[in-house]
């Protein structure tokens, strides 16, 4: 019986270590389901490899972990909600959406770990732009980014 418990614990430890490597690696995505899976697995780096990806969004894609989304020169139609002290960098491509804020930044309760959005080398076309909620600590950095939106909040 002890041998069985020990094997079970070793298997759990092995799976935990394996999950660390899976979430740490950069993931290339070509399809919507791969993108959803990368977000669900809280990947630290997501690289869009499809020329145009249109996410089916009834709601915003919630990001509550640190990640870098590299559009790799491609276009993504999606909206994001960044919250709980997450740090998200979106770079190197185009974001496009209508009718919703393309990115909603929700504040963190922790002054030491604000919710952070970094935009680099992007073109953003959106009807409502970026919305920053004043419900906590936030930080937004914008570098070499063109935004065309009807409104900013």
Label each region the model flagged:
Residues 54-68, 75-118, 126-136:
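Extracellular beta-strand-rich solenoid/capping regions of secreted or surface-exposed proteins
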Residues 1-27:
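Gram-positive cell-envelope targeting signals
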Residues 24-29, 72, 76-77:
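Short domain-boundary/entry signatures in modular proteins, especially
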Residues 150-153:
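Acidic/polar low-complexity surface segments
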């Amino acid at each position: 019986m002890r041998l069985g418990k020990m094997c079970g614990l070793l298997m759990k430890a092995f799976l935990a270590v394996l999950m660390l490597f899976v979430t740490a690696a950069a993931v290339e995505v070509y399809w919507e389901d791969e993108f959803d899976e990368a977000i669900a697995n809280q990947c630290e780096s997501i690289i869009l490899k499809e020329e145009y990806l249109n996410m089916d969004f009834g709601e915003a894609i919630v990001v509550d972990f640190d990640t870098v989304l590299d559009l790799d020169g491609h276009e993504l139609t999606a909206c994001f909600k960044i919250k709980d002290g997450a740090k998200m960098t979106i770079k190197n491509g185009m974001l496009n959406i209508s009718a919703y804020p393309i990115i909603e930044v929700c504040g963190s309760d922790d002054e030491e770990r604000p919710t952070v959005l970094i935009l680099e080398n992007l073109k953003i076309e959106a009807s409502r732009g970026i919305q920053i909620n004043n419900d906590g600590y936030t930080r937004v950095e914008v570098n070499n980014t063109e935004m065309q939106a009807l409104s900013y909040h």
